[in-house]
Amino acid sequence: MSANYWHSTQCRFWSFTKEQLVTMRQKLEEDNAELVRMFPLPQQRRLYIYFNQQLIRLAKRLTIRQQSMATAQVYMKRFYSKVEIRRTNPYLVIATAIYLACKIEESPQHIRLIVTEARQMWGDLVAIDTSKLGECEFFMISEMRSQLIVFQPYRTITALRNELSLVDDEVQLARSVINDHFMTDLPLLYPPHIIAMVAILLALVLRPNNSGPGQSTSGAAAAAGLAAAQQALMRAQGQQAQGGMPEPAAAEPKEKRQQDRVSRVQKFAKWLVDSNVEIASMVDATQEIISFYECYEHYNDKLTREQINRFVKARGLDK
């Protein structure tokens, strides 16, 4: 085990470029062309959303910690970067990922309890027992080459909270963005600290002006906030390249809370320049998150579920 992300197996073996991921997935589809033709599936993002929802449902029944849930989601991404989805029962893979992640994160769950809860959730979709879960665990560990330690972005949020003067609402919103990023390719593309920086930036620009329990950001305000985030990053990137400080925005908002928010975003941009964070990576990751939120608006749970269940039953993977 490495205590340093840069020397970890996650950094050395499980960090890819977008082009590498595309190539890996294309090869899987080419190697399983007949299955792909017979059982069309929604685009990858929609599958991620569905798997995320199912994983959360099972995890809540087991009262599993967020860290273990996050690791389980990374395991699924790694596993399905090596194995064609249509050759597996995703429900068994979800249960296995949770079981394995809990052991690695030192909060183990009894295998019989996970089997029982999985049966109750997906009874007619997976004939799961302890031996099948154990076999799937061995399969998953083998495909991941026993490289099971996962560094998560949550730690960075905690470490920087005081330095960046983040309030409770901003920390909570940043953690929510991190939770959402597991439904994208970002865990396989960028280091955890980059994801954390993006989450903090989005928390600063998306937090409602009148923050209070149960209040949310309107669609128009969210769109404006995301645009502001991209603008701040581009400005910081330009200044970082020049070795200078980010310039303040030309126009000052009249509304005080909005002015305070812009000021905090500018201070964060200055902090990014001073800290030599890879702002280009942040720009790409921010765009990926924004693109995901746009995709989520059009997500069809019923269609996704039906297409997954169709190949599970047609191939006898529920037996």
From Swiss-Prot:
Localization per record: Nucleus
GO molecular function terms noted in the UniProt entry: cyclin-dependent protein serine/threonine kinase regulator activity
Superkingdom field: Eukaryota
Disordered, as annotated region: 237-261
InterPro entries, alphabetized: Cyclin-like_dom, Cyclin-like_sf, Cyclin/Ssn8, Cyclin_N
Matches recorded under SMART domains: CYCLIN
Span of domain Cyclin N-terminal: 53-142
UniProt family annotation: Belongs to the cyclin family. Cyclin C subfamily.
Principal subcellular localization: nucleus
Composition skew (Basic and acidic residues), residue ranges: 252-261
Ranges of biased composition (kind: Low complexity): 237-251
Protein name in UniProt: RNA polymerase II holoenzyme cyclin-like subunit
GO cellular component: nucleus
Keywords carried by this UniProt record: Activator, Cyclin, Nucleus, Repressor, Transcription, Transcription regulation
Role of this protein: Component of the SRB8-11 complex. The SRB8-11 complex is a regulatory module of the Mediator complex which is itself involved in regulation of basal and activated RNA polymerase II-dependent transcription. The SRB8-11 complex may be involved in the transcriptional repression of a subset of genes regulated by Mediator. It may inhibit the association of the Mediator complex with RNA polymerase II to form the holoenzyme complex. The SRB8-11 complex phosphorylates the C-terminal domain (CTD) of the largest subunit of RNA polymerase II.
